[in-house]
Each structure stands twice: as structure tokens, then as C-alpha cells.
Amino acid sequence: MTHRGGRVAYRKRWLKEFRDWGIVAVIVFGLMTLFNIYVLNVSTVVGQSMQPTLYQGEKLIVNRIALSFGPPKRGDVVVLHDPSTGPDRKEYLVKRVVGLPGDIVEVKDHKLYVNGVQAEEPYIDTEIQDPDFAAVTVEQGNYFVMGDNRHAGASKDSRYFGTVSKKMIIGKAAYIWWPFSKFNAL
């Protein structure tokens, strides 16, 4: 009888430990899900619109809480919901903030101007090859975003779908983490 009682006690201990590990796994999964939704998440670059800064397939760490501590700044690389419509609509876009609320943004002679001053853009490799874009004033709470790829037709951005509200921006792209050889802060 003691042998049978020992097996029963062992089985109860094993089941209790299995249950405890299951509870820990559910809690860890829940915390990681919340962390991914509200703090940091991983995004994959799709397309060429941010070349030469970002290339197809690179993985980014997106800081989702950065915008809770302050608005996007000029030059920030952000991930946003695609505001466009149509068959080429994507879930998310990666773009650079070039115009802040109240700014006047235009493309003149294939160069970007913000508030009448030619923007310094060390991250681009060519002048803008798309047609010039008439001056637009960025509304309060909105941002003018562009892709770094200035070759003709290479970026679907605020020149095509207009300014984007802060609510459309889900986070700031903080790092390139893959491929690891390109690990870098943005």
C-alpha cells in the first residue's frame, strides 16, 4: 500500500508542478503580448520606399511608447497605418517625418523645402525625381511624411495621400536589428 500511496503522491506533485508551469507560461505569454502591443514590436521592411536608409527584408524594432512622451520630430523614421485606399494599400508604411504641424512643405526644382528653406537631407542619394509639389501647410496634429527613396514613383507618401494624423503613427522605428551586420540606431 505504501508503494501505491507513493505513486499517487508523486503523480499529484507532478500534476501540481505541470499546472504551475502552465500558469507561468500563460502569464509570460500574456506579458510578452502586452509588451509587443504597447511597448516594442518588430516590423519587417517591405518595399523600396526607404532606400538607401532601409532595404527590403530588414527587421526593425519599433518603439511604440516613444510618442507617449512627446510628438514625432523632424527626421524621425516612423511606422504608420497606411492611409491610402486601393489595391496597393498595405497595413503599415515606414516613412520619415519631414513636416511638423504648422510647417509649409513643398517640392520645388526637385528639392524639398520646409518653411521656405531647402531641407538638409543627408539620408537621400538623389534629388527628388517626381514632379514638383505645391506648398501645403501641415495642419495641427498632423505630419508630412516621405520615403527616403526619391527616385520617380518609388515612395507612396504624403505627396500622394496627404498629411497623416498623430493617431495614424503607431511608433518610432528605433533600430535595425536584422541582418545583424546592419544593427544600427535610426
Each language-model region and where it sits:
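Solvent-exposed loop/turn segments at secondary-structure junctions
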Residues: 66-68, 84-86, 105, 112, ...
